From Swiss-Prot:
Belongs to the selenophosphate synthase 1 family. Class I subfamily. The active site is at residue 17. InterPro entries: PurM-like_C_dom, PurM-like_C_sf, PurM-like_N, PurM-like_N_sf, SelD_I, SPS/SelD. Homodimer. It comes from the Bacteria. Binds 1 Mg(2+) ion per monomer. Keywords: ATP-binding, Kinase, Magnesium, Metal-binding, Nucleotide-binding, Selenium, Selenocysteine, Transferase. ATP binds at residues 20, 48-50, 68, 91, 138-140. Its EC number is 2.7.9.3. SUPFAM superfamilies: PurM C-terminal domain-like, PurM N-terminal domain-like. Pfam families: AIRS, AIRS_C. This is Selenide, water dikinase.
Length: 348
């Protein structure tokens, strides 16, 4: 019997990190979980909504554990595999670590062409290999909607763990990739994006945060998270709350992918953006006349987005230069950390 040949994006209701449960609903669910007892070796757990868990094994080594998976946002199965793997590996880099082993998480309809699944797995394998980790197995579920990602284990020195809870007043805030992926993925699904812009979006999503994180070996950064489904302002809010600070974002310095503003002006906006805005906006003050489309994109759910880094002001410019030399060519200073004020975030 001939297998189905539907496009990947035709088999999903939402793609990439835009398919995540919204932050407000998720926070409500997680608030019902019991707290872990005071476990001395659990360095990072549930409390600060961080990117991964970190468990101290001994004085020299801690284990980083994370997983991530989502539905397709592109039709090319190999590229989808690359994007999903890059996104999954990112959490390890955000914690200051090195990925060691990864395992596939696969949901795929058995009625569909299995060569498509093979291409997805090849894309994931190649990105894991690029990261320096090993792909060692996985688990599958027969599901009408395809989903793919990785469970990743990494290591880090216990005294070099990076967190979203350690931003300091006086720090500068750096982003390592431009935003607007969610808006443009939505437009791409409708065939509304020029090919050179679509190629740029894919290039951004498959780029490993490994290259930006290489600079952490030379520069002492204070706090890091990665920007994914909750958007720039959503993950900035997590950092501000966890660190008990406020953060100022200079909107004119935030890098936005070509075409994203135009699509947002036309109302091409993923549902995840509205979920993010509903949850986060009460903690945000907007100062000045900032275009509505730009404000919207600050809430845009990113798929395999960049790192958000808080670092001492005197190190910020040199850190950006170093990251660019390592391949994070669009790294940019976008704001500052200030003492806790009335609002957690001010957009200027």
């Amino acid at each position: 019997m001939k297998k189905e040949q539907k496009k990947l994006t035709e088999m999903t209701t939402a793609g990439g990190u835009a398919a995540k449960i919204g932050p407000e609903v998720l926070a409500s669910v997680l608030s019902q979980l019991p707290k872990n007892d005071n476990i001395e070796n659990l360095l990072v757990g549930l409390d600060t909504a961080d990117d991964a868990a970190v468990y101290k094994l001994n004085d020299d080594m801690a284990l980083i554990q994370t997983l991530d998976f989502f539905t397709p946002m592109v039709d090319d199965p190999y590229v989808f595999g690359q994007i999903a793997a890059s996104n999954s590996l990112s959490d390890v880099y955000a914690m200051g670590g090195k990925p060691l082993v990864a395992m596939n998480i696969v949901c795929f309809p058995s009625c569909h062409d299995m060569d498509v699944l093979a291409e997805i797995l090849k894309g994931g394998f190649d990105k894991v290999k690029e990261s320096g980790a090993l792909l060692v197995g996985g688990h599958t579920v027969d599901d009408k909607e395809p989903k793919y990602g990785l469970s990743v284990s990494g290591i880090v020195s216990p005294n070099k763990v990076l967190s979203n809870a350690t931003a300091k007043p006086g720090d500068k805030l750096i982003i390592t990739k431009p935003i607007g992926v969610g808006v443009l993925n939505t437009a791409m699904k409708e065939g509304m994006v020029e090919q050179h812009i679509a190629d740029k979006v894919i290039e951004i999503m498959i780029h490993l945060n490994k290259y930006a994180a290489m600079s952490f070996e030379k520069f002492d950064v204070n706090s890091v998270t990665d920007i994914t489904g909750f958007g720039l302002l959503g993950h900035t809010l997590e950092m501000a709350k966890a660190s008990e600070v406020s953060i100022e974002i200079e909107s004119k310095h935030v890098p936005i992918i070509e075409g994203a503003i135009e699509m947002a002006q036309m109302g091409i906006i993923p549902a995840g953006m509205y979920k993010n805005m509903h949850y986060v906006s009460k903690d945000v003050e907007v100062v000045g006349n900032i275009e509505v489309a730009v404000q919207d994109i600050l809430y845009d759910p990113q798929t395999s987005g960049g790192l958000l880094i808080s670092v001492k002001e005197e190190l910020a410019e040199e850190l950006v230069k170093d990251m660019k030399l390592n391949g994070a060519i669009e790294a940019k200073i976008i704001g500052s950390v200030v003492p806790k004020g009335e609002k957690y975030i001010t957009v200027l």
